[in-house]
């Protein structure tokens, strides 16, 4: 089942708590104080306009453009999400250019460039850290069935 994170711009206050939670959950010690600026890598991004703020994350597309353009097949669907195999990634940025949502990022380090994106915190039993940390509950982890149920509740009788 295709799961993804959806952001409600009417609830987002732009606090970036989701970014911190994401970076910490993907760091080996999971300790905010232990993160250096080079290690602070969030897979979700808060974007701001003069009238609104919202979070942007991978939409876990069924026919993912990022996976389709990867020249080394480093991007595939695993564990119910689009996954980047870091050992295969060559950091070419093709995936970043192909993503219609701007959810792919290529991060350079001293060793090599690598593509990163939301993996729905597959390593956490409780689900995505950003969803859990959001103080206004602007983020939700959804699947197609949840979206359909939500739409049915919103339709007038």
From Swiss-Prot:
Residues 2-32, 48-80, 80-109, 112-144 form the 4Fe-4S ferredoxin-type domain. [4Fe-4S] cluster 1 binds at residues 12, 15, 18, 134. [4Fe-4S] cluster 3 binds at residues 58, 61, 66, 99. [4Fe-4S] cluster 2 binds at residues 22, 118, 121, 130. Keywords: 4Fe-4S, Electron transport, Iron, Iron-sulfur, Metal-binding, Repeat, Transport. The keyword Electron transport applies. [4Fe-4S] cluster 4 binds at residues 70, 89, 92, 95. Disulfide bonds: none annotated. Pfam families: Fer4_11, Fer4_4. One of its GO terms (molecular function) is metal ion binding. InterPro entries: 4Fe4S_Fe-S-bd (IPR017896), 4Fe4S_Fe_S_CS (IPR017900), RnfB_subfamily (IPR050294). It comes from the Bacteria. This is Putative electron transport protein YsaA. It comes from Escherichia coli (strain K12).
């Amino acid at each position: 089942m295709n799961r993804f994170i959806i952001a409600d711009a009417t609830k987002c206050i732009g606090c970036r708590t989701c970014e911190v939670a994401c970076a910490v959950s993907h760091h080996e010690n999971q300790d905010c104080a232990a993160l250096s600026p080079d290690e602070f890598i969030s897979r979700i991004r808060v974007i701001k306009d003069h009238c609104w703020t919202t979070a942007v994350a991978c939409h876990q597309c069924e026919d993912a453009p990022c996976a389709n353009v990867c020249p080394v097949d480093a991007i595939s669907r695993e564990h119910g999400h689009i996954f980047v195999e870091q050992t295969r990634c060559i950091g070419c940025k093709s995936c970043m250019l192909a993503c219609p949502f701007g959810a792919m990022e290529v991060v350079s380090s001293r060793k090599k460039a690598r593509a990163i994106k939301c993996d729905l915190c597959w390593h956490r039993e409780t689900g995505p850290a950003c969803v859990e940390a959001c103080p206004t509950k602007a983020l939700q982890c959804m699947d197609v069935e949840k979206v359909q149920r939500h739409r049915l509740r919103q339709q007038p009788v």
